Amino acid sequence: MVDSNDDQPERHALLHNDIQTSNNSRPSLVQKKYLPTPQDTRKSRASYTGSAMINPTSKQSRTGSGAQRTSRTAQKLKLLPEEPFQRDSERLTDLKNQEVYSQVNRIKDKPARRDAEKLGKAHRHLLPRSTAYCTASSYNMKELVRWLKDCRKLHHTHPKLFDECLYTPFIYNDWRGDKRFEDEDVIRLDDEGGEIIVSDKHPDLFIFEYGVVVMWGFTEREEKAFLNDIEKFEKEKLAEEDIQVEEFNYYVTKSYQPRIYNDFITLRDGSNYMVKLSISHAIAQSVKISLFEELVDNTIEDTQDIPQEIAYSGKVSMSKEDIMKSIGELFILRININLHGSVLDSPEIMWSEPQLEPIYQATRGYLEINQRVSLLNQRLEVISDLLQMLKEQLGHSHEEYLEFIVILLVGVEVLISVINIVVDMLASQH
């Protein structure tokens, strides 16, 4: 993931762990919605359901640098209403799709604002990482569960399956020792900022059936080691240049409400894996969509010269077979994007744990998943129209060729008939 510049406008989404809002908070034109964070229930509903991913058959090469979302560049802010269940339709209409580019001044909590002003590239090495990798079409979840259970003593694993997501704590004791009982590392970025806990003593894994793994609290070395460990469970492994990555940093503080700001995730409780689960679902969907964006970019590169070729020469060098293959690949991409429920729909866990839904939706909004999917479909539709036009043109050319053959055969038959008549006339004269 490309780190955003400190002087760029920064994107900000709020995740709140308390349904109630302060009575003395003043209403303002720009408001924020504090979303409920679930209690640390520690319960799970496990099942082995899920669907396999459909992938393009042709090998693609990676041409981009990751997710195509504006929060990586311009980092726009979509403000949310202050009340979590507000029913004032007029206020919702006024705030809908409102975008702000000076988010730091919009943060009313002084400690949060001071920390937001300080956080930047220079602090990423101080904070624990939250990284998502898309490495394959899918994972063999049953074998993964069995392997993680076998690692219980070595890595302190305790796997739980939430539909298409497999959760477990995971610790590399050989590299970091047993930190589970050490004191928290607390720092302050600013004298007026909040107390920030930067300890990574709760490393958590979220493995998604559709080929994505999200790691919380891992070092880069540990991330690479784990990716090597799960290679044997990958189905249709991606080439190294095709692997997609989303990088965030996170920290824990009780000084202000949780949020996602400039790719920094603020949590109130670092040990609450249910909150991490809801955030991880959105991040996993985002990194999977990044793969689709790369595939679409590659398809555009392959077809961008066709209109110019038609304009200059009036002909197309592609054969009908190549065009049909390209059309088939486009349909596969559309199926992956629109019909694969794990990538687009709210996860099943949100039905059984509805208190997680606001956190998931806020993260999903930050990552601009709906907008990116809509843009992907528009681009695919343009390419599809082009290829369909080429297919029809080749069909017309084939029809013209058949007509030419028929005319030629008729001409030959007429010529033969004329020759026969001439021969008969000459024979009758003799």
Curated annotation (Swiss-Prot):
Main location: cytoplasm
Tagged with keyword RNA-binding: no
A Gene Ontology cellular-component term: fungal-type vacuole membrane
Compositionally skewed regions (Polar residues) per UniProt: 18-28, 46-73
InterPro entries, sorted: DUF155, RMD1/Sad1-interacting
Keywords: Cytoplasm, Meiosis, Sporulation
GO BP annotations listed: meiotic cell cycle; sporulation resulting in formation of a cellular spore
Keyword Endoplasmic reticulum belongs to the record: no
Compartments it resides in: Cytoplasm
Region: Disordered, residue numbers: 1-73
Family, per entry: Belongs to the RMD1/sif2 family.
Function summary: Required for sporulation where it is believed to have a role in meiotic nuclear division.
Miscellaneous comment: Present with 952 molecules/cell in log phase SD medium.
Protein name as annotated: Sporulation protein RMD1
Source organism (scientific name): Saccharomyces cerevisiae (strain ATCC 204508 / S288c)
